[in-house]
A protein has these predicted regions:
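Short, conserved phosphate-binding/catalytic loop or strand-edge motifs used
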Residues: 137-144, 324
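Active-site-flanking structural segment that lines cofactor/substrate pockets
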Residues: 70
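Disulfide-stabilized, aromatic/cysteine-rich ligand-recognition loop
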Residues: 1-55, 59-66, 74-133, 143-168, ...
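Functional-site microenvironments in short loops/helix caps that host divalent-cation chemistry
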Residues: 149, 153, 163-212, 217, ...
Length: 444
């Protein structure tokens, strides 16, 4: 397993760029991808779609490498021809609503992709080691494209881990040193905390010294009313009560889109749950394990919303401004200092979720505000005031500001670098599974 006891796992500071630090950060990023993909037993499995709305895994193996070349070319940092076919083939991911994207064929030989990746790695290292590397990189710098590509690869480390988790268990093996956080003696109860009203400002500060994606910039001032929030995220044990009470058979708990989805997929439990001989198991990354009842339940947004309706008493999911209020009162700096990460299951500290509240720092505050699993929010994905597209990646956020994409915050155990920042704003279709869960909230 990648050594998580060093700072090369954490997002680089853009105002004090040093080639050795940037090189370590890039290599750590690259090695995370290599480690994850080493879990695939046979090359043939790279050409299987673990999720029919995604490309086969071979695409993502090549995509993160091609992205470096394509963005560096746009920025003017690389102008040679490496492999035009691969640069085009691996350029853009799949749009689940586009049939032509889903039916793309003609994927290259695995070994050819390995060679391509090796060449890309050499190119990136040569750019990092060049005397022209600046000491400071900002939004307007051509080298922003390099940071963009590194953080993009870290995003795909996490999203690819979700795809691999959907492979048949016989197709994968757990890499050496990959650790699950199993602790069955920690059984928190559902507890609510009162949060007083307050003002918040959403958005990454313009003078931030970390890389940020375009949708993180801009700002929005909000007044947040007082509310009560569950101290911990909802656990597998708590979600079992919803299942046992007929939650998946009761239409009133579901939105129309959610009900249609679970019926079309014949769902009766969360994606990674397994029931065999009247006993529940959980599909972890590479194993089927006894159900860890104290882990946060991992669900799609539709399931989280249905649970809230089942609970009654006007229970709902957090809005982004409410989540921001919680983090403002927990954190006083942008990127937690290195020692503070000991309080959260993030930056690949473990290769799985952990018992909710296991790393609780302050008994008066909600737990797992960063890491463990993503926090599913109520918001549709939307731009902040003053949002502007970055010219190096014009379609990163803009096409997804709509009611079809819901937001998440806080990161997961698999979130690293920029993704582990409290300013990171994630979005997904509400029927897409991620390492994501939720907590309950009600307005007072």
């Amino acid at each position: 397993m990648i050594n998580t006891e060093n700072q090369s796992n954490f997002s680089i500071k853009t105002n004090i760029i040093a080639s050795d630090n940037l090189e370590a950060y890039f290599l750590n990023t690259w090695e995370l991808t290599e480690l994850l993909f080493s879990s695939i037993k046979d090359v043939e499995s790279y050409y299987i779609n673990p999720d029919p709305r995604r490309h086969p895994l071979i695409f993502y193996f090549g995509h993160v490498a091609a992205f470096y070349i394509n963005k560096l070319k746009i920025a003017g940092l690389y102008s040679e021809t490496l492999n035009t076919h691969f640069e085009n083939l691996f350029a853009v991911g799949v749009d689940p609503s586009t049939k032509d994207d889903l039916e793309k064929h003609g994927w290259p030989n695995y070994q050819e992709v390995v060679v391509f990746r090796t060449e890309v790695k050499k190119i990136i290292l040569s750019i990092i080691q060049s005397d022209s590397l600046p000491k400071c990189i900002d939004w307007d710098s051509p080298y922003w494209s390099l940071l963009m590509a590194i953080e993009h690869e870290r995003i795909h480390f996490e999203t690819s881990s979700v795809l691999i988790r959907q492979y048949d268990i016989e197709m994968v093996k757990k890499p050496d040193g990959w650790m699950y956080k199993l602790d069955y003696d920690f059984n928190p109860e559902l507890e609510f905390i009162k949060v007083e009203s307050g003002n918040v400002q959403l958005g990454r500060p313009s003078n931030s010294n970390m890389y940020g994606w375009d949708n993180e910039y801009g700002s929005l001032n909000c007044f947040v009313k007082s509310f009560e929030v569950s101290k911990n995220m909802i656990t597998n044990a708590e979600f079992l009560d919803f299942i046992s009470s007929g939650g998946y058979e009761t239409k009133d708990y579901w939105s129309e889109a959610g009900w249609n989805w679970i019926k079309s997929q014949n769902l009766s439990m969360p994606k990674f749950w397994i029931i065999r001989d009247q006993k529940y198991y959980l599909r972890a990354m590479f194993d089927e394990i006894d159900m860890p009842w104290n882990w946060p339940v991992e669900v799609i947004a539709y399931e989280a919303e249905a649970f809230c309706r089942w609970k009654g008493n006007n229970m709902r999911l957090l809005y982004e401004a409410e989540w921001k209020l919680l983090t403002d009162r927990y954190f006083n700096n942008e990127l937690l200092d290195f020692d503070s990460y000991s309080n959260f299951n993030t930056n690949f500290r473990f290769g799985s979720p952990s018992p909710v509240g296991y790393f609780a720092l302050n008994s008066d505050l909600p737990t797992d505000l960063l890491g463990n699993v993503w926090e599913i929010l109520s918001n549709d994905f939307y731009p902040l005031d003053g949002f502007k597209v970055h010219p190096y990646y014009k379609d990163f956020s803009l096409p997804f500001f709509d009611s079809g994409h819901g937001m998440m915050a806080g990161g997961s155990w698999a979130s690293t670098g920029n993704s582990a920042s409290r300013y990171y704003r994630l979005w997904f279709r509400r029927d897409f599974i991620q390492h994501a869960g939720f907590r309950l909230i009600k307005t007072i």
